[in-house]
Amino acid sequence: MRSLALLVILASAFVGTAWAEDPSGIEPQALSERMESGDTELLVLDVRSTAEFDEGHIPGAINIPHDVLGERIAELGPVGERDVVVYCRSGRRAEIALETLKGAGFNRLFHLEGDYLRWSEEGRSVVRPSARP
């Protein structure tokens, strides 16, 4: 009986660890609410190209393209200090970036559900460059 109880405890610990390593999804509404509340434990990371970022991005987001994230990861600050919400245009590059971040030890990771396409389609706030004369 003791060995069964021990097995259940060990299995629970393993499952909990496995779940903690997988990034959670965050809905656009939930991200908006956290941003509006001034949440200082939040970092929004846009992993699209610089050209895409310059065309429009989520307010307060920082841009590190997914293909150079490994080289520039120190720009995100100490591992584990903030929740990192990652997005790209539609999801593929964000998944690659999330794997890079997990490999670097980040564990407070979130993937924006629907990425930038959904965010902008829902009419949420977007920073766009001012029109040039």
Spans of features found by a protein language model:
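Rhodanese-like catalytic fold shared by cysteine-dependent sulfurtransferases
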Residues: 2-5, 12-42, 50-83, 92-133
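Phosphate-rich cofactor/ligand-interacting catalytic cores and adjacent structured alpha/beta frameworks
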Residues: 46
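Short, surface-exposed ligand- or partner-binding patches at beta-edge/loop junctions that are enriched
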Residues: 87
